Amino acid sequence: MIKERIFTVDRPEFELHGVIVEPETIIPDRPFVVIPNSGLVHHVGTCRSSVQFTRALAKAGFLALRVDLCQLGDSSTRLDNESMTDDERTIQELQAVLDQVITDYMLEHTAKVVMYGLCSGSQNSFKLAVKDDRVVGIMGIDHFGFQNWSYYCVHYVKQVFRLSPWINRFKKLIGKAMPMV
């Protein structure tokens, strides 16, 4: 039988809250899964998707956590230095989450984590993975939208074949060339 319990990271600068779902038996060599909130949606996830996913992971034998970063859902506002960038704050918060899970479940020697995220949760997972060797995988949905050459090709091709801008330009040209009397 899986168990769900409240998860808290209590630091002087911030306090984070979430729900951790435990499998019947925790296997120390198995990675645990962390799901940071996405955008303004708290740890329940879009249409409770994070709830359903963490429960399914626990039934499959994985320790799984859904958590709110600062200023979202149940978590507090940060009380510390304003000189940190948003990325630095996010990485610090997620590393504190990993540290707390590792301490609570005595996973010091085998700590591996897979991050799962939707949209900004995916981006935050990627940022953490770049900085923290404990992250062994990322499952990201709607991760990044880079504006590369194909983006611009599609964008401008659509613009060229839209009729209304051409008509508006033609009307402006005629209006300037032949003033209305």
Segments (PLM) and residue ranges:
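Short, surface-exposed "cap/lid" segments of acyl-processing enzymes
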Residues: E24-D68
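N-terminal cap/lid segment of alpha/beta-hydrolase-fold proteins
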Residues: M1-P31, D87
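The alpha/beta-hydrolase serine catalytic core
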Residues: R134-V181
